[in-house]
């Protein structure tokens, strides 16, 4: 099965590069020469039956007729990968993108509102529906990840608010415990990897700045995103993921494509493309 998994991992690497090259502000392409201009976020383009796949809580999109399935499970970062991934795998697999704003799959934790401390029942309902799919999976490929530092440790871009009014907590105490959340996710990986191949996508850089809204067309040449800032946000989850082991667990490291330890910089753009926006 490795002969199948490794091409999928290669495709993911390529899609991470190209799908995070996104321009969304109308008119910006007239000021900066950008070949990959598009009028809306990538996750809005994948549709079925005249409805976007992103944000569906029921009737999840399903492309292809193969018995072999790829299930993409995550948030808007994964929603941006779904569009091209569908085209690249649908001839050999049934592709099921389950992508929701701020979604991270945990089985034994509760999601609460940090404003009201109330349990988010809609998350539980969505999770139950997803469990009916993945708990019966056998010899599928399940791709997991997203803004994992946020979901596991409440960390996001250095110096910026979270923009997420929720928190995963222990199901019994309804209190946050990083160990409880880690154990939940580790058990999920162990359970799913008994019968499936799991691709775990490590954190992607989040720069915390919209280079278009800030009108950086004159400053873009000198804009720097430091690798040390990325690590301050994500080192904890990287170390945690490094410690998860399974013979059917395969790992993808997007930050290694963009970040250079020696220069302490992560590339945000080249002469023609932005790699990501915020």
Task: Please identify what each model-predicted range represents.
Residues 1-278:
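Extracellular/periplasmic envelope-modification machinery, especially enzymes
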């Amino acid at each position: 099965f490795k002969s199948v998994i490794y091409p999928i991992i290669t495709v993911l690497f390529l899609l991470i590069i190209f799908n995070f090259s996104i321009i969304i502000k109308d008119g910006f392409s007239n000021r900066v020469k950008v070949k990959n201009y598009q009028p809306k976020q990538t996750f809005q383009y994948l549709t079925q039956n005249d409805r976007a796949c992103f944000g569906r809580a029921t009737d999840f999109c399903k492309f292809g007729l193969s018995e072999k399935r790829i299930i993409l499970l995550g948030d808007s970062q994964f929603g941006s990968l779904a569009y091209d991934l569908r085209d690249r795998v649908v001839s050999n697999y049934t592709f099921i993108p389950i992508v929701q704003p701020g979604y991270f799959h945990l089985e034994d934790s509760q999601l609460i509102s940090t404003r009201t401390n109330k349990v988010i029942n809609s998350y539980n309902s969505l999770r139950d529906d997803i469990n009916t799919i993945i708990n019966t999976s056998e010899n599928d490929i399940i791709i997991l990840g997203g803004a994992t530092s946020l979901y596991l440790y409440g960390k996001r871009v250095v110096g910026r608010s979270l923009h997420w009014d929720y928190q995963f907590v222990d199901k019994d105490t309804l209190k946050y415990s990083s160990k409880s959340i880690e154990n939940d996710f580790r058990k999920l990986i162990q359970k799913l990897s008994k019968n499936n191949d799991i691709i775990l996508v490590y954190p992607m850089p989040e720069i915390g700045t919209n280079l278009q809204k800030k009108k950086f067309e004159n400053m873009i040449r000198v804009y720097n995103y430091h690798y040390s800032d990325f690590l301050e946000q994500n080192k904890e989850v990287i170390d945690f993921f490094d410690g998860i082991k399974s013979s059917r667990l395969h790992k993808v490291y997007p930050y290694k494509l963009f970040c250079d330890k020696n220069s302490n910089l992560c590339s945000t753009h080249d002469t023609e493309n932005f790699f990501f926006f915020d």
